[in-house]
């Protein structure tokens, strides 16, 4: 389970940063989920290791252009009208109308493989055997939703050696024991599966909050997350701009991380005003956040972040981008 940042700038792209988009890779099922799709996102796919062919779900936070202007181009290029798997999109009310209008005026036909789910309230919006996705209404100028992806806990490792020592015959019975069930052997012995399994492995939690000013819903959504990606459009000294435009500062993002007891915070969605050469730069925002929540990082385009299993090293590993800057 890992994420790749495809865009980390707010409002407009810069020479080194595209606008918002994050890809969540689920390697165990060769599947890719996308969060937001700013202008140029499909170009970022081409410059990265993530594959459009694995894309199955897109989660849109809100309908501002820097989060959706790349959506139509990406969908048109993804082969929805032909063979291959479909794509399901989740987002605020109006997203379906936007896509319909784009298709109508551009004479684009996406076929029947696209399904749009309108998000209208907090709560569970998707679930399968491995994952749950919840959304929460944030505080922005238009309806904006944060998303929480939660992996379900996995059964603990089955102790085959112990089972063999007990004389349990290999076969379908092992599958029942792995599920923690109690089985009765032919000789009358009752074996509890839970006695042959290690403790269940907790699932991982990834939370994405943007665009928003500091709010209680972000804290609730991010509770105990392994990784929180939170917008930090402004520096602390520009807090009035954040309140006026309902965006977050670096210190607001850090406060959410602290109050939600997350493991790691990665800030994104930076205003171009902090680009290199300006009096205040992103390193200053990082220092502000780390003073509140030390385990904070800055996102950059093409950065890939692995979210390790809870039984692994608790430190989240960060790999070096392999692609050239956008």
UniProtKB/Swiss-Prot annotation:
Keywords of this entry: Endonuclease, Hydrolase, Metal-binding, Nuclease, tRNA processing, Zinc
One of the record's GO molecular function terms: 3'-tRNA processing endoribonuclease activity
EC number: 3.1.26.11
Cofactor binding summary note: Binds 2 Zn(2+) ions.
Domain of life: Bacteria
Catalytic residues of the enzyme: 66
Residues annotated as binding Zn(2+) 2: 66-67, 211, 269
Cofactor(s) it depends on: Zn(2+)
Amino acids binding Zn(2+) 1: 62, 64, 140, 211
SMART domains membership: Lactamase_B
Recorded catalytic activity of this chain's protein: Endonucleolytic cleavage of RNA, removing extra 3' nucleotides from tRNA precursor, generating 3' termini of tRNAs. A 3'-hydroxy group is left at the tRNA terminus and a 5'-phosphoryl group is left at the trailer molecule
Subunit structure: Homodimer.
HAMAP family associated with the record: RNase_Z_BN (MF_01818)
Family: Belongs to the RNase Z family.
Role played: Zinc phosphodiesterase, which displays some tRNA 3'-processing endonuclease activity. Probably involved in tRNA maturation, by removing a 3'-trailer from precursor tRNA.
Name this protein carries in UniProt: Ribonuclease Z
Species of the source: Synechocystis sp. (strain ATCC 27184 / PCC 6803 / Kazusa)
Primary gene name: rnz
């Amino acid at each position: 389970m890992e994420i790749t940042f495809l865009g980390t700038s707010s409002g407009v792209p810069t020479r080194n940063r595209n606008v918002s988009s994050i890809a969540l890779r689920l390697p165990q099922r060769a599947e890719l989920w996308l969060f937001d799709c700013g202008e140029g996102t499909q170009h970022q796919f081409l410059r990265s290791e993530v594959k459009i062919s694995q894309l199955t779900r897109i989660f849109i936070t809100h309908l501002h252009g820097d989060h959706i202007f790349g959506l139509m181009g990406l969908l048109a290029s993804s082969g929805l009208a032909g063979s291959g798997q479909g794509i399901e999109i989740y987002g605020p009310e109006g997203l379906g109308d936007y896509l319909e209008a784009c298709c109508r005026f551009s004479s684009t036909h996406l076929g029947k493989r696209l399904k749009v789910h309108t998000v209208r309230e907090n709560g569970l919006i998707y679930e399968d055997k491995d994952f749950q996705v919840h959304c929460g209404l944030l505080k922005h100028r238009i309806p904006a939703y944060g998303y929480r992806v939660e992996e379900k806990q996995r059964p603990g490792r089955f102790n085959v050696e112990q089972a063999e020592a007990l004389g349990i015959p290999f076969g379908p019975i092992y599958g029942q024991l792995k599920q923690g069930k109690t089985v009765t052997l032919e000789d009358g012995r009752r074996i509890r599966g839970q006695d042959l399994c290690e403790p269940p492995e907790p699932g991982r939690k990834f939370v994405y909050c943007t665009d928003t000013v500091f709010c209680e819903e972000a804290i609730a959504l991010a509770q105990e997350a392994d990784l929180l990606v939170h917008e930090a459009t402004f520096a602390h000294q520009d807090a009035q701009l954040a309140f006026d435009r309902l965006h977050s500062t670096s210190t607001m993002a850090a406060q959410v991380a602290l109050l939600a007891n997350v493991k790691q915070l990665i800030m994104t969605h930076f205003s171009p005003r902090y680009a290199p050469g300006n009096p205040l730069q992103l390193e200053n925002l990082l220092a502000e956040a780390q003073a509140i929540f030390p385990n904070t990082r800055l996102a950059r385009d093409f950065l890939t972040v692995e979210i390790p299993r809870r039984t692994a090293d608790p430190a989240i590993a960060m790999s070096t981008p392999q692609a050239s800057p956008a």
